[in-house]
Amino acid sequence: VAKRSPLAEKLDEVQGRIAAACAKAKREPGAVTLIAVTKTAAPEQIRELLQLGVGDLGESRAQQLSQRAMQLNEFYQRRKQHGDEAVPDKLRWHMIGHLQRNKVKAVLEVASLVHSVDSLRLAEELDIQAAKRNKRQPVLLQVNASEEPSKFGVAVGAAVHLAEQIDSMPALQLVGIMTMAEAEESEAKIRHTFVRTREVFEELKWHKIGGTSLRHLSMGMSHDFEIAIEEGATMVRIGTALFGGKPGDEVMEKE
């Protein structure tokens, strides 16, 4: 038997933990998508991930997202043409970090999903630029449910109103919400952040905002994804548990 690489072993471990958290929460393991956050990964590690079947990749900086997508998309297409069964059916890039309006054009070129829509002005710019490309861009509303001033995201109390505004934009498709918990907090505080986020999600559902498209809760990173899954996460953003680095490397704080 060929020896598994360190990355393959880490991926096995993370996928096992996701499956165990799903079982504990009485959820199907397929209900949670692993997004590999490639911020600290070397290009060859990302290529290896693709060949291990991981098709959802996340970056927190617009420029790096564009560069990585250019490098990897070509490799992915070549593997597909060679009939490589191991590579995933689709390669999806996720913009998970704070997005400035002047970077919107570049991000729309490559992002399948923008997780970090946290203001009306950003939503309007995304809507304008997506319309120019004749595309309907899936987005998540970022909510600051931990109420930490260092975190991006709309305040919980303003989330429904902003969601309604996004939902009315013809070139955007609101498919869910995203949040980040504080890395240093207690488990109880982290869980509270995720519960509040789920409550906002339920409130949007109740108001029929987003319609049937509203189905994603992007929450949980390397240090807290099991708690997030127990509280309903459908996407977890994992970097350090796969590639090393210090906890919170997946996060982007306010400058």
Q: Could you tell me what each predicted segment is?
A:
Residues M235, D249-E255:
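Active-site loop ensemble at the mouth of alpha/beta enzyme cores that anchors a bound cofactor
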Residues V1-F225, E231, F243-G245:
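Conserved alpha/beta-domain cores
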